[in-house]
Amino acid sequence: MKNILVTRIDDRLIHGQVVTAWIKQYPINKILIIDDELSRNKLMERIYKAAAPVGVEVMIMDQEHAEGFLKEPPLAKEHIMVLVKVPQVLERLLQSGVGFNKIILGGMGAKPGRKTFNKNVSANEDETECFRRIIDSGVEIYYQLVPSEKEVNIRKLLS
C-alpha cells in the first residue's frame, strides 16, 4: 500500500491553501487527484500540474486506476496527498481495501440540492450518508481548512 500522508476532500482540489499550508506542513512530494472527468481533460491536467510547487509531482487518475496505484508497494521517500472532490470516491477506495488513517474535509461548496453545514461545507443527502458510512467503517473525518486550525470531527456537523 502506498504511503498516504494526507487524504483530503476539497472540491477546488489544488489551490492556495493546499499549496501554501498543507504541503508545507507535511513532507508531501506527490499529489494524487482522483477524478474520472478530470482524468480525461488534458488541458486541466496541465493547469493542475502547473499549480503545484516545484518538487511536487501531480498525478490525475480515474477511480479504477487510482485504486490499483494506491495498492502498489510504496516507493522509498514517496509521500502522497490524495485529493478528491466528493466522499463517494474515498468510500469506493475503502471498500476496495485501500486504507486511510483519517480524512480531512476542506471545502465542498454550496450547490442546488446541498445543505450548508458551515460556511465552507455543503453536502447533499447522498454525500451526507456517504460521510456517515465512512465514519461507521472506522475512519474519522475532520473538517479543517488549514493545518493551523483545530480539527472538527464532522460527526458534530452531521448531527
Predicted regions and their residues:
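Long, hydrophobic N-terminal alpha-helical segment
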Residues: 2-52, 57
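Structural motif
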Residues: 3-7, 29-32, 57-59, 78-82, ...
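A general structural motif
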Residues: 10-13, 62, 123
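A generic local secondary-structure boundary/capping motif
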Residues: 20-21, 70, 92-94, 129-133
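Short gly/pro/ser/thr-enriched loop/turn and capping motifs at secondary-structure boundaries
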Residues: 39-41, 66-67, 110-113
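Short, hinge-like loop/turn segments at secondary-structure boundaries
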Residues: 49-51, 77, 120-121
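Ordered, amphipathic secondary-structure segments that act as subunit-interaction surfaces
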Residues: 61-106
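Glycine-rich, aromatic-bearing surface loops/beta-hairpins
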Residues: 96, 101-159
